[in-house]
Amino acid sequence: MSFPEGKDILLMGNEAAKAAEAFQRSLKKIGHRRTQSIVGDKIITVSETVEKPTISKSTKVTTPPERRNAWGEKPDTTRNQTEEARNEATLEDTSRLYEEVFAPTSDGKTPAEEGMETPEKPKKKVTFKNDESGRYTKLEMEALELLSDNEDDDAESSVLTFEEKDTSALSLEARLESIDEKLSMILGLLRTLNVATAGPTAARDGIRDAMVGLREELIADIIKEAKGKAAEMMKEEAKQKSKIGNGSVGLTEKAKELNKIVEDESTSGESEEEEEEEDEEESNPDDDLYSLTM
């Protein structure tokens, strides 16, 4: 038995590949045809085309079944009539609403425009009117505003200082306005003082007594504080006297001994120096500058 050689095996493999490709192509086509290989040789394929069966379409029209109630009653025949009536009613209602919304009122505005307007603020039920009758009411109000001004919150506010405001135009009118403002302020202060002191006699006496009592309390507090300081100074002086004595300073026994030793040493040193100087003068009498030789 002879085995095939390598060339024969390669040829058989190529033919098998070509046959497989032809079979795949034949499946994609509708009818049975003979295909050709890449080389050009005709190859008879074993594939057979199977024709698709024709599906007969029925021309019968199927109608949906009618709805029936569970209790076997007949369907309502008046449903279509009610739907038509409802549609007509909705059209009439919408037209009526359209006329009501867009119909102008007596003011010439439609209700929609009136609704878009901003609502008015509620009016106050009680209104307080300032009684402006009088000659100095305006000045009095200005003075009260100045007196009620809180200087702690506003560093620039001051009741008792009258500094001119920084005006860009240094004209005569600006100066007159500033002078008028100062005068109105002064008159307002005088008016408030007049009102405060123009009460009955009992009220004025009460104010005076209160001021006098306040003054006496302040004086008593000052005197009390001064007396307390003086008493503290006297106590401190007494403590110092008890420590020092009569004011004379005395030495202790050890201090006295040390002082005596120091004094002895100082006196002995001075005497020795004096003796040495005398001996030198006696030994050298010719060294005197004032001695003259004839």
From Swiss-Prot:
Residues 52-97, 234-294 are annotated as: Disordered. The keyword Phosphoprotein applies. Belongs to the pneumoviridae phosphoprotein P family. The keyword ATP-binding does not apply. Residues 12-28 are annotated as: Binding to monomeric RNA-free nucleoprotein. Residues 281-294 are annotated as: Binding to the N-RNA complex. Homotetramer. Interacts with protein M2-1; the interaction between the two tetramers is required for the anti-termination and elongation transcriptional activities of protein M2-1. Interacts with host phosphatase PP1; this interaction recruits PP1 to the inclusion bodies. Formation of a complex PP1/M2-1/P allows P to target host PP1 phosphatase to the M2-1 substrate. Interacts with the nucleoprotein N; the phosphorylated phosphoprotein P binds to N-RNA complex. Interacts with the monomeric RNA-free nucleoprotein N. Residues 123-128 are annotated as: Binding to host phosphatase PP1. One of its GO terms (molecular function) is RNA-directed RNA polymerase activity. Plays critical roles in regulating RNA replication and transcription through its interactions with multiple proteins. Tethers the RNA-directed RNA polymerase L to the nucleoprotein-RNA complex. Recruits the M2-1 protein, a processivity factor that is required for efficient transcription of viral RNA. Acts as a chaperone for neo-synthesized nucleoprotein by forming an N-P complex that preserves N in a monomeric and RNA-free state and prevents the association of nascent N with host cell RNAs. Recruits the host phosphatase PP1 to inclusion bodies to regulate viral transcription. Residues 264-294 have a biased composition (Acidic residues). The modification Phosphoserine is found at S106, S148, S157, S158, S168, S171. This is Phosphoprotein. Residues 169-194 are annotated as: Oligomerization and binding to RNA-directed RNA polymerase L. Coiled coil: none annotated. Keywords: Host cytoplasm, Phosphoprotein, Viral RNA replication, Virion. Residues 65-97, 253-263 have a biased composition (Basic and acidic residues). It comes from the Viruses. Constitutively phosphorylated by host. InterPro entries: Pprotein_pneumovir. It is found in: Virion; Host cytoplasm. It comes from Avian metapneumovirus (isolate Canada goose/Minnesota/15a/2001) (AMPV). GO terms for cellular component: host cell cytoplasm; virion component. Residues 135-157 are annotated as: Binding to protein M2-1. Residues 251-279 are annotated as: Binding to RNA-directed RNA polymerase L. Pfam families: Pneumo_phosprot (PF02478).
